[in-house]
Every structure is written in C-alpha cells, then in structure tokens.
C-alpha cells in the first residue's frame, strides 16, 4: 500500500490549496477516526495541537468535525510545540495525536502530523491505511455516538513542567544571559517561561505571533537576527527554534551558529564518556556532514545513517535501541526525554553543559571541522518528475564520477516541499561547487 498525500513528515502544502484544504482535513479526520475506533466497545479520544498559523484554526475545525463524526472525542490544546503532542497523547490515554504545523515553512503553508498512542509518529504503513480509508466510503457514527470536543487549557503548562524536569535539579541558570528566538511560533510562551523559571536572564525574540509572521526573518532557519541581538546585549548563548519548536540551532557568544551536527557531536561525546550513549551509537541522516562522521569515529562512536526525516531517525533509534539521534537541520531526538525532536529540551541540555563545565558556548558548540558542503534547492511544479529526465540523470552520473574518492553527492526530492535538493561535500570546494551547479542547471532546464 503506497502513500500519495503523506510525505516524510505528514501532509504539507499551501493552505486552502490541495492537499491542505478543509475538505481534505475533514476526510482525514474521519478516516483516522474510523481507523482508531475499530473497537467501538471503549471510548476513544484524540489530542490536537497547532502552531500559530492563521490557517491552523480552519484545519483544526475540519479535523474535529471529521473525527467527532466517527465517534472520536477530541481534546483541543492551545498553540503548543509539536513535542507537546507527543508527550500529551499517551499522558491523556489518547489513541491518536495530531499536530497542525508546517514546521519551518512560511505562514502560507500548513501541515498535519499524526502520532500514535505511544507518542511516536505513525509508521508509513499506518499512514497508508488511513490514506486508503480517505478514498473509501467512511461509515459515520450513529447520532447518539457522535464524539465530543473540549478544550484542555493546561496542556501547555504540563509540557513546560516536563521540559523543566529534564534539567538537572542541582543546576540553575542564574547569571546566564540567554537570547531565545521563538520564530513567532508554537514556543512563544513556553520557551521564555522555562528559561526564566530556571533562573536565566532571558532576552526573548519572535514572541509576537499574528498568524502570518511565523518563521518570518526569524527562528532556526534565519538565525542572523538572534546573532545580532547576542552581540548587542552581550548574551552568553542563543537558542533559535523553528515554528513548531521541534528543531533548534544554537548561537555562541560571538554570534557563530552551531547546527544539529555540532550539537549532536557534543551530546554524543558527553554521553559516551558517561556511559549513557546506548549502543555507543548516534543515529543521523544522510545529510549530516562527513566531519561529524570523522569526529565520531575518533571517539569510537558509531554513526548510523538514515533516510532524511526525523521520523526515520526515530524508527532507527527504536529498532536499534539507541537513545540519541537527529538531523543537521536541528532535530535533536533524545528518547530518554521525548518521543520526537524537541528544540527546547535540546537547548536546555546544552545550557546544562555550560553550567556544569563552566565553559563558554563557543568552546562547547564547535567540536569538529566541517567538510565543505554546498546545498542548493530547485523548485518544481507538483506532479513533475525532473529527476527522471535523461539530461539530469547524465549530470548526476557525471558528478558522481568527478567526486569519486574525494567527496560525496546526494540528490533527493524533498518530502515536505516541491523541491529537488542537491547536496555535495568535498575538500575541493571549487570542484564541489562546479558539480552542484552542473546538476542544478540540468534540473532547472528539466522543470
């Protein structure tokens, strides 16, 4: 059974345009309700969270209508980070968790992510079954069994307490000035509150969401503003989250950015030294830098490569019994603490290292020399298949041959946007850039 709607992180697209329409959300809610309510002898419930996008309310209402029409009870959260849904779904004994978010994408986009009763994202197979149900005639509940919907007003505060509980109780953040950029997204209340309650001097940015400014010139994909603020106020460190707060990048006191690879390198070494790194293995995607792989090898730590997408990182972690993984983009997954990437928890663990060791962010955050890497994206029309074009395949083959023995090449279709991503790594930057430019040119000609 194959998936067409679902990508690497649920369903995503431009709001009010297929597939992110109220009609599709309604059918998805009904299909998911039907799937999880197959045993009608017990009450069933679903938790729904959302970020701060204007379209989130439309999609939330459509999902709620679909779910309740099949007899599911719906628990509605205020805007919360994605990991809060992963936490609260099992806590509230729900069959299903839903997060309405397009993560780091612009406000015009939105998405739907599905979580199982254990708080982990649903497998490809379950998503495929739900998608198949969407195309079928879905039986509705009798009038007396229609589900109910209610708001859960303390969900965000339950999440805040959980995040704080991951910070060592013997440590405090007193004397530490922290810039936190919440991307005008889901963590705009939680992140400053957590840091303040733990004692930090908090300089908050991106905490004025208006429904249209999420990720706009801020957050983990645009850390320049936070870097400037750090230099302006003399902060010790910066934490930049994305729109749903499941990814993070850090900024040291000089304004230099540390991506997910650098963050994972620090945690992997510390945990390995302490005997906490299960299997002495880090799970990361094929996008992670070769420099990370070399650093881990020097520390006798195994790098387990996965497909792109934090869900595939988590699947590999669960299959192998590992407890640390993530992506270069900033998804940091620590299954000792959470079921999915949690930017705020990852940021707190970094602050704990600063306090525990007395070392600066710049000392802790840059553990290896990155191999030069270039990544370029080419947008294409939905439904097109530029990678199938003979000229593109020839350019890829030529690039692979030129980089043989001196670098690596990765070309893939994004699972969340209509983009072809062309990435190369090599010590010879001129060669690497030329290879990428040739392939990008061929893809652009094909679209």
Swiss-Prot record:
Cofactor note: Binds 1 Mg(2+) ion per subunit.
Positions bound to Mg(2+): 103, 242, 244, 246
CDD domains found in the cross-reference section: GlmM
Stored PROSITE patterns: PGM_PMM
Post-translational modification: Activated by phosphorylation.
UniProt keywords, alphabetically: Isomerase, Magnesium, Metal-binding, Phosphoprotein
GO BP annotations, alphabetical order: carbohydrate metabolic process; peptidoglycan biosynthetic process; UDP-N-acetylglucosamine biosynthetic process
Reactions catalysed, as given in the entry: alpha-D-glucosamine 1-phosphate = D-glucosamine 6-phosphate
UniProt enzyme class: isomerase
Residues bearing the modification Phosphoserine: 103
Cofactors, names only: Mg(2+)
Annotated GO MF terms: magnesium ion binding; phosphoglucosamine mutase activity; phosphomannomutase activity
EC identifiers of the protein: 5.4.2.10
Record-annotated active site: 103 (phosphoserine intermediate)
Main function: Catalyzes the conversion of glucosamine-6-phosphate to glucosamine-1-phosphate.
PANTHER family named among the record's database cross-references: PHOSPHOGLUCOMUTASE (ALPHA-D-GLUCOSE-1,6-BISPHOSPHATE-DEPENDENT), PHOSPHOHEXOSE MUTASE
Protein name as annotated: Phosphoglucosamine mutase
């Amino acid at each position: 059974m194959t998936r067409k709607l679902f990508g690497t992180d649920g369903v995503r697209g431009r709001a009010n345009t297929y597939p992110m329409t109220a009609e599709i959300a309604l059918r998805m809610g009904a299909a998911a309700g039907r799937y999880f309510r197959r045993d009608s002898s017990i009450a069933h419930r679903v938790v729904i969270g959302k970020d701060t996008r204007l379209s989130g309310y439309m999609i939330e209402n459509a999902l709620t209508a679909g779910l309740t029409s099949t007899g599911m009870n719906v628990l509605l959260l205020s805007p919360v980070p994605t990991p809060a849904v992963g936490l609260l779904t099992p806590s509230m004994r729900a069959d299903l968790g839903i997060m309405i978010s397009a993560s780091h994408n612009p406000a015009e986009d939105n998405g739907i992510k599905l979580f199982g009763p254990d708080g982990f994202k649903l497998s490809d197979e379950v998503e495929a079954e739900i998608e198949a149900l969407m195309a079928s005639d879905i039986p509705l509940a009798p009038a007396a069994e229609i589900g109910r919907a209610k708001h859960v007003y303390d969900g965000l505060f339950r999440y805040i307490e959980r995040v704080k509980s991951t910070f060592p109780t013997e440590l405090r953040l007193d004397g530490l000035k922290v810039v936190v950029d919440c991307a005008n997204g889901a963590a705009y209340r939680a992140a400053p509150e957590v840091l303040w309650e733990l004692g930090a001097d908090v300089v908050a940015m991106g905490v004025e969401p208006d429904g249209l400014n999420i990720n706009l010139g801020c957050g983990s994909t645009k850390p320049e503003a936070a870097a400037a603020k750090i230099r302006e106020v003399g902060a010790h460190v910066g934490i930049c989250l994305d729109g749903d707060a499941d990814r993070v990048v850090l900024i040291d006191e000089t304004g230099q950015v540390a991506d997910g690879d650098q963050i994972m390198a620090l945690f992997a070494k510390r945990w390995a030294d302490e005997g906490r790194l299960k299997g002495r293995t880090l799970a990361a995607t094929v996008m992670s830098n070769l420099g990370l792989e070399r650093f881990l090898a020097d520390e006798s730590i195994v790098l387990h490569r996965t497909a792109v997408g934090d869900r595939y990182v988590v699947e590999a972690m669960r299959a192998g019994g590992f407890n640390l993984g993530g992506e270069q983009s900033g998804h940091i997954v620590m299954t000792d603490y959470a079921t999915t990437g949690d930017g705020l928890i990852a940021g707190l663990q970094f602050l704990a290292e600063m306090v525990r060791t007395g070392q600066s962010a710049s000392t802790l955050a840059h553990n290896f020399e990155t191999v030069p890497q270039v990544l370029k994206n080419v947008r294409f029309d939905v439904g097109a298949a530029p990678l199938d074009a003979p000229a593109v395949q020839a350019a890829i083959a030529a690039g692979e041959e030129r980089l043989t023995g001196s670098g690596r090449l990765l070309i893939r279709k994004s699972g969340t946007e209509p983009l072809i991503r062309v990435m190369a790594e090599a010590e010879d930057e001129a060669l690497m850039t030329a290879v990428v430019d040739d392939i990008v040119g061929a893809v652009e000609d094909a679209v």
